[in-house]
Swiss-Prot record:
Signal sequence bounds: 1-21
Role description: This protein is transferred from male to female during mating and may affect egglaying and behavior after mating.
Main location: secreted
Gene Ontology BP terms: mating behavior
Location within or outside the cell: Secreted, Extracellular space
Superkingdom of the organism of origin: Eukaryota
Tissue spec: Main cells of the accessory glands of males.
Protein name: Accessory gland-specific peptide 26Ab
Length: 90
C-alpha cells in the first residue's frame, strides 16, 4: 500500500513538472563606438555607431531584433547611408 501511494505521488509530481511551460528567454546586447579627431581646429566625429540586439520568446517563438545606427561628420550622406544599410543587414 505504501509503495502504491508513493508511486501515485511521484506520478502526480512528474505530470505537474512536465506540464509546465518552458521558461521565458530574453537576451539583450548593445555596443557603441565613437572616434573623434580635431580637423582644421574643429572636433569632428569620424564615426559614431551603436548596435542593439535582443532575442526573446515572449510569443512562444524565438524572435531576434537588430537595430544599428551610424553617423559621421567627414563622410558623404551616400557613404553614411551605405554603412547604415550594411550594419542593419548584419
Amino acid at each position: 500500500m505504501n509503495y502504491f501511494a508513493v508511486l501515485c505521488i511521484f506520478s502526480c509530481i512528474c505530470l505537474w513538472q512536465f506540464s509546465d511551460a518552458a521558461p521565458f528567454i530574453s537576451v539583450q546586447s548593445s555596443s557603441q563606438s565613437r572616434s573623434q579627431k580635431v580637423m582644421n581646429g574643429m572636433l569632428r566625429t569620424l564615426y559614431d555607431y551603436s548596435v542593439q540586439d535582443s532575442v526573446n520568446d515572449a510569443t512562444g517563438h524565438l524572435i531576434h531584433t537588430h537595430k544599428a545606427d551610424f553617423n559621421s561628420d567627414v563622410m558623404s550622406p551616400e557613404e553614411i547611408e551605405r554603412v547604415r544599410q550594411q550594419l542593419n543587414m548584419a
